Regions:
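N-terminal cap/lid segment of alpha/beta-hydrolase-fold proteins
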Residues: 1-30
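Short beta-strand element of the alpha/beta-hydrolase
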Residues: 35-45
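Short substrate-entry loop that stabilizes the transition state in hydrolases
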Residues: 46-67, 73, 78
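Active-site catalytic motif of lipid deacylating hydrolases and related acyltransferases
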Residues: 74-89
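Alpha/beta-hydrolase active-site loop
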Residues: 85-106
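Alpha/beta-hydrolase fold nucleophile elbow
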Residues: 108-121
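Conserved small/polar residues in nucleotide/adenosyl-binding loops
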Residues: 124-130
Length: 134
């Protein structure tokens, strides 16, 4: 499993945004032209960042040998919401991030039924409204 740290300019947030991605071993990608690898958006908790799951859990070991892309964005303490006087983390997470990640990883699924989201209960509930991918 490859671990990639990606920083890209987010137009929604108007700043550089950090994302850590776990990408399956090439041997786990069943077909070279596969465009349907499932994806998990793994959200961190308060005071965490895009690397919290790697540093504080066995997520990399648990996912080794699976055919799953895991995307862990950094939202600081943004609570995954759009705010009037802060950042629009919900829009960035639900709309912009899947599109950007699809450009980085063209074989990542676009299917809603193969797109998952997880994280601390107190935050994940904020991401449940209907969105294009998440």
């Amino acid at each position: 499993m490859a671990v990639m740290n990606i920083e890209y300019y987010s137009e929604v947030l108007d700043m550089e945004w950090g994302v850590t991605v776990l990408y399956p071993d090439a041997s786990r990608v069943t077909e070279p032209d596969c465009t349907d690898i499932p994806v998990l958006y793994l959200l961190h908790g308060m005071s965490g960042n895009q690397n919290s799951w790697l540093k504080r859990t066995n997520v990399e070991r648990l996912l080794r040998g699976t055919n799953l892309i895991v995307i862990m964005p950094n939202t600081s303490n943004g609570w995954y919401t759009d705010t009037q006087y802060g950042f629009d983390y919900f829009t960035a997470l639900a709309e912009e991030l899947p599109q950007v990640m699809k450009r980085f990883f063209p074989n990542m699924t676009s299917k809603r039924e193969k797109t998952f989201i997880a994280g601390p209960v107190s935050y994940t509930h904020l991401t449940l409204p209907t969105t294009p991918y998440v």
